[in-house]
């Protein structure tokens, strides 16, 4: 079955208003049909707007009986209207269906995560976590880049939305996460950091990564990874500073096939396994320290492990976890089980 290359005509309407509800009323007086939000698939805020805070709009949306709690929250690196105007479905004939499907790519790439309105709202009200949203942008010639300045080997994951070197008729792309402190946007994570986040939070289903090739300098080995066990997290306080240990278990299938390299050799697999462990430990540690030291916000919900150290709710509340999280230190341990994903193990 082939997808249609033509999308049904859609209309983007903009209105200046003091609130979402009054804006909808104004639009209803202008168009021939009453707006129904029961099939709304995504809510888009521009970065510029999100930096000022989105709590008022969020509470209004949550209180709207028509909007489903699984509606996605997207923070656009451009104006929200520009983001909507650049939606160009190539394999779906219905724009709403396109929004629904494009956000499921997190299940097999881990470069973004499917963040619903209910998830964002719960994290906003939760004293042990901070909210985050999907990071979106526009893919066009002016934003396509041929290379990245990232120092990690997994260069394909070091992009954010509107930076990927993809030439496509699709006008929008979602890659990375928008990080919040309270209701205000404070920063962004790229695709590689998002992968680390999903491993820590046990939301990784599968992904393809590239690790440095221990047998050929300057080249990489592609690997398909999944989590074999849930990440085990332990938190304790040392001089009131949170010390967080994360034990991670992954399985990997080698996708690359290199001439002269025997993937059936135990020593070869052991070496690749050690490189995989070191690569993931470095990337995940970098992500954790970025959230703690730079953004100062706990989007991985480590607070749920800290709360058990307090005997009463008042003790927990007075500890001010959101402020203390920036003092955290981390220890990441990765244990990988690697095998060749090819029918051939030696050529």
Question: How does the language model describe each region?
Answer:
Residues 1-347:
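Membrane-proximal alpha-helical signals and transmembrane carboxylates
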């Amino acid at each position: 079955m082939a997808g249609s290359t033509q999308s049904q005509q859609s209309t983007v309407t903009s209105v200046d208003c003091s609130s979402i509800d009054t804006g909808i009323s104004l639009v209803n007086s202008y168009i021939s049909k009453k707006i129904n939000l029961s099939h709304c698939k995504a809510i888009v805020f521009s970065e510029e707007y999100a930096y000022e805070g989105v709590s008022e709009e969020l509470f209004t949306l949550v209180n709207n009986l028509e909007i489903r709690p699984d509606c996605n929250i997207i923070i656009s690196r451009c104006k929200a209207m520009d983001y909507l105007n650049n939606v160009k479905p190539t394999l779906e004939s219905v724009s709403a269906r396109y929004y629904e499907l494009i956000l499921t790519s997190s299940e097999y790439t881990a470069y973004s995560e499917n963040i619903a309105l209910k998830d964002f709202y719960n994290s906003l009200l939760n004293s042990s976590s901070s909210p985050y949203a999907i990071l979106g942008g526009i893919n066009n010639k002016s934003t396509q880049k041929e290379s990245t300045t990232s120092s990690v080997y997994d260069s394909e994951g070091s992009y954010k939305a509107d930076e990927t070197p993809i030439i496509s008729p699709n006008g929008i792309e979602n890659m990375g996460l928008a990080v919040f402190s309270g209701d205000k946007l404070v920063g962004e994570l790229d695709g590689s950091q998002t992968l680390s986040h999903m491993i820590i939070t046990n939301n990784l289903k599968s992904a393809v990564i590239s690790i440095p090739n221990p047998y050929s300098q300057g080249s990489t080995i592609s690997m398909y990874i999944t989590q074999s066990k849930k990440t085990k997290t332990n938190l304790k306080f040392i001089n009131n500073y949170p010390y967080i240990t994360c034990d991670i278990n992954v399985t990997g299938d080698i996708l690359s096939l290199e001439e002269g390299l025997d993937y059936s050799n135990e020593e070869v697999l052991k070496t690749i396994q050690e490189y995989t462990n070191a690569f993931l430990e470095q990337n995940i540690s970098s992500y954790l320290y970025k959230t703690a030291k730079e953004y100062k916000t706990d989007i991985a919900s480590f607070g749920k492990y800290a709360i058990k150290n307090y005997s009463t709710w008042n003790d927990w509340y007075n500890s001010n976890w959101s402020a203390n999280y920036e003092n955290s230190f981390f220890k990441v341990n990765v244990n990988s089980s690697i095998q060749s994903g090819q029918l051939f193990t030696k050529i």
